[in-house]
Structures are given as C-alpha cells and as structure tokens.
C-alpha cells in the first residue's frame, strides 16, 4: 500500500504486526505532461494566476489542439510545503510575461516540488529558482 510516497507493508507474526516502509517516487503529485479523455475543455482565463489551476484544466493546457498551434506550458510553484524566497512569485511572473500567453503561471500548493515546469511530454522540477533553466525549458519547448 502506498501512503504519501511511501510503500507500506504489514506482516503478522505471533499476533504482532510489523510494518515496513520504503521511500518511493510512485504517488508523487506533479503537474501533468499529457491529458486524459476526462480533462476539462477550458484554458486558464489569464496568463498569470493567483489561484491554483484545476488538475483537469491543467491537462487541457497540455493538449496540442487546445486553441494554440503548439502545446501550452505550465510554470507552477508550491510555497505552502516549501520555503520560498519572498520575491519568488514576482521573479517567476517577470519570466513568464516575457513569453507568449500560452505559458501559464500558477500556484500548485499540493504538488511535490517547489517549482515545476510542464510542457507536453516534458517535466522539469526545481528546488531553487534558476532563471536560466526556466527560460531554456520554455524556449526549448515553445516550438515542439
């Protein structure tokens, strides 16, 4: 059984139950890089969002035919579970606004990363703000 990224198993011996755990990447919450048939047929209303984008809407952002010639991209951050620099959102906003409107910025307070960038079929997670890596990811995936 997986619990919060841990594999948990119980063994009963002589009336006692012993639990074993091991770390696993299975079960992590990260932005989607594709979409399912059940995704929402809507895109975020604006490029810079102060509220989280619903998961099924995030999936539609990954759909190549979602109103853009190319697949859109998500730049998301989690300042609830991770300690963020006071100006992190401001710096991410500055980066995103230098790209076309199909690059979206939003908080994602339940993801298992401080910063995550998602494009169709691609994902980059960062523990610290790296403007060069973020710009490169967006540029490299803009024409795919």
Model-derived features with residue positions:
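Mature extracytoplasmic domains of secretory-pathway proteins
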Residues: 57-105
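Functionally engaged cysteine thiol sites
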Residues: 37-39, 79, 111
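Helix-rich interaction surfaces within compact, conserved domain-sized segments
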Residues: 95-144
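Hydrophobic membrane-insertion alpha-helices, especially the h-region
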Residues: 2-18
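Surface-exposed, low-hydrophobicity interaction/linker segments
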Residues: 20-63
């Amino acid at each position: 059984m997986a619990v919060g990224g841990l594999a948990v198993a119980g063994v009963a011996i002589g009336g006692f139950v012993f639990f074993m755990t091991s770390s696993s990447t299975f079960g992590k919450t990260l932005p989607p890089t594709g979409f399912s048939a059940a995704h929402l047929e809507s895109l975020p209303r604006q490029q810079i969002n102060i509220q989280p984008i619903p998961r099924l809407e995030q999936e539609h952002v990954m759909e190549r035919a979602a109103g853009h010639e190319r697949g859109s991209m998500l730049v998301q951050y989690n300042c609830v579970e991770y300690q963020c620099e006071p100006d992190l959102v401001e710096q991410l906003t500055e980066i995103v606004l230098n790209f076309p409107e199909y690059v979206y910025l939003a908080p994602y307070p339940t993801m298992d990363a401080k910063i995550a960038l998602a494009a169709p079929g691609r994902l980059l997670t960062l523990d610290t703000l790296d403007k060069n890596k973020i710009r490169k990811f967006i540029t490299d995936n803009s024409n795919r």
